[in-house]
């Protein structure tokens, strides 16, 4: 008699995705981040649900309700700290997951890659609206600055901004709708993740060599389920350590001050995981140009599969492309640093140079290097 997990209508879907899934035997620890992102999403949804039970989306009580959660709710301080720092861990895993895809040429599975880029945009949007909810100074001014960017679009800009605000400034209507979006979007992300996984399992995973692995596959369980479990434990230990020992390490001190529309903080900056994009936005003096550069800094990922010129899939056997990949990583770190600095010399110039290098690497250097590597391989 056949095993129930292979015959039951629901169980066989789970079986095909997580138990008997044929997996390349040589995938490294860099392939752990997909499941870690799933863990992050579940953690954020659960902690967020418990926070939403005690939070009030009203400008007169939002800040106080967060203080109430931390002071009076059973383990409220822990739930909030895990939720706030969980976002940072989410983005660490996201950026590493995208970097792995870039390095090993996983972007050649175009549907999976494009859904992944959409997931990245959705997650960034969710994190942005979530940052507004505690209604501290940086929440309020961050919301004001970023939503105001939409006014750069010709003709419809001002109407668009007021439509998003629900009035003539960031006010109660804005907070209420941002809370609604912040509650809804994680479930949209969960749905899109299912599609991401479904599309991935049509082709199967890539592997570090970039070669076809049909000849050497193993079942996902027990080999990679335990490998993922080890990753889960490591990440949860890291997250709980940050949440318990230094919960405010990655936050902004300005957000401990209730929002005041009459006092602007000296340096308005987003959370650390948006600083690279913020630096690109600030490096262009023109408002519309800055907004387009900000959008394109993420959407450029969608062009990567089209700009792939090499005959080899990954960077494993391509030293020149490896150098450029690590140059891109270094450039993003420089942009992250610049995004947190004030708008003054020499930071403005460094930001402009780093932004130019960022786009030049994606659009010119990487495709050109791939083409040159092909030439070198044919050279005799």
UniProtKB/Swiss-Prot annotation:
Membrane topology listed for this record: Multi-pass membrane protein
A cellular-component GO term for this protein: respiratory chain complex III
PROSITE patterns: CYTB_CTER, CYTB_NTER
Cofactor(s) listed in the protein's UniProt record: heme b
Ranges in coiled-coil conformation: none
InterPro entries: Cyt_b/b6_C, Cyt_b/b6_C_sf, Cyt_b/b6_N, Cytb/b6-like_sf, Cytochrome_b, Cytochrome_b_C_euk/bac, Cytochrome_b_N_euk/bac, Di-haem_cyt_TM
SUPFAM superfamilies listed in its UniProt record: a domain/subunit of cytochrome bc1 complex (Ubiquinol-cytochrome c reductase), Transmembrane di-heme cytochromes
Domain of life (superkingdom): Eukaryota
Principal subcellular localization: mitochondrion
Binding sites annotated in the UniProt record for heme b b562: 83, 182
Annotated localization: Mitochondrion inner membrane
Ligand binding (heme b b566): 97, 196
Cofactor comment: Binds 2 heme b groups non-covalently.
GO biological process: mitochondrial electron transport, ubiquinol to cytochrome c
Residues that, per the record, bind a ubiquinone: 201
Transmembrane region(s): 33-53, 77-98, 113-133, 178-198, 226-246, 288-308, 320-340, 347-367
GO terms of molecular function: metal ion binding; ubiquinol-cytochrome-c reductase activity
Swiss-Prot/TrEMBL keywords: Electron transport, Heme, Iron, Membrane, Metal-binding, Mitochondrion, Mitochondrion inner membrane, Respiratory chain, Transmembrane, Transmembrane helix, Transport, Ubiquinone
CDD domains, per the entry: cytochrome_b_C, Cytochrome_b_N
More details: Heme 1 (or BL or b562) is low-potential and absorbs at about 562 nm, and heme 2 (or BH or b566) is high-potential and absorbs at about 566 nm.
Subunit comment: The cytochrome bc1 complex contains 3 respiratory subunits (MT-CYB, CYC1 and UQCRFS1), 2 core proteins (UQCRC1 and UQCRC2) and probably 6 low-molecular weight proteins.
Family the entry assigns: Belongs to the cytochrome b family.
Protein task: Component of the ubiquinol-cytochrome c reductase complex (complex III or cytochrome b-c1 complex) that is part of the mitochondrial respiratory chain. The b-c1 complex mediates electron transfer from ubiquinol to cytochrome c. Contributes to the generation of a proton gradient across the mitochondrial membrane that is then used for ATP synthesis.
Protein name: Cytochrome b
Source organism (scientific name): Acipenser sinensis
């Amino acid at each position: 008699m056949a095993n129930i997990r292979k015959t039951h209508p629901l169980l066989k879907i789970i079986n095909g995705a997580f138990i008997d899934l044929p997996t390349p035997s040589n995938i490294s620890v860099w392939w752990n981040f997909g499941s870690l992102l799933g863990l992050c999403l579940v953690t954020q949804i659960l902690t967020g649900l418990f926070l939403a039970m005690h939070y009030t989306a009203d400008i007169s009580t939002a800040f106080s309700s967060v203080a109430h959660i931390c002071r009076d709710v059973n383990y409220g301080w822990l739930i909030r700290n895990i939720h706030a720092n969980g976002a940072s861990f989410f983005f660490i895993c996201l950026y590493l997951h995208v970097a792995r895809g870039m390095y090993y040429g996983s972007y050649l599975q175009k549907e999976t890659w494009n859904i992944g880029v959409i997931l990245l945009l959705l997650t960034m949007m969710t994190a942005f609206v979530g940052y507004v909810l505690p209604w501290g100074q940086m929440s309020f001014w961050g919301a004001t600055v970023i939503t105001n960017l939409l006014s750069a679009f010709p003709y419809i800009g001002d109407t668009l901004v007021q439509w998003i605000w629900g009035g003539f400034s960031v006010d109660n209507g804005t907070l209420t709708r941002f809370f609604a979006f912040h509650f809804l979007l994680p479930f949209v992300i969960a749905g899109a993740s299912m599609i991401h996984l479904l599309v991935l399992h049509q082709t199967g995973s890539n592997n570090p060599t970039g070669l076809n692995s049909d000849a050497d596959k193993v079942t996902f369980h027990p080999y990679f389920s335990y490998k993922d479990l080890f990753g889960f434990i490591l990440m949860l230990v890291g997250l709980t350590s940050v949440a318990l020992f230094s919960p405010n390490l990655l936050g902004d001190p300005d957000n401990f001050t209730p929002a005041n529309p009459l006092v602007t903080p000296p340096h308005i900056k987003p959370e650390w995981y948006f600083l690279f994009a913020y630096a690109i936005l600030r490096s262009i003096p023109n408002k519309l140009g800055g907004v387009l550069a900000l959008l394109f800094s993420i959407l450029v990922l969608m062009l990567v599969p089209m700009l792939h010129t090499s005959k080899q899939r990954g960077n494993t056997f391509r030293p020149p492309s490896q150098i450029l990949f690590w140059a891109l990583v270094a450039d993003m770190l420089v942009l992250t640093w610049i995004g947190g600095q004030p708008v003054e010399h020499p930071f403005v110039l460094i930001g402009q140079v780093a932004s130019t290098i960022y786009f030049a690497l994606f659009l010119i250097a990487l495709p050109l290097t791939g083409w040159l590597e092909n030439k070198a391989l044919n050279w005799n």
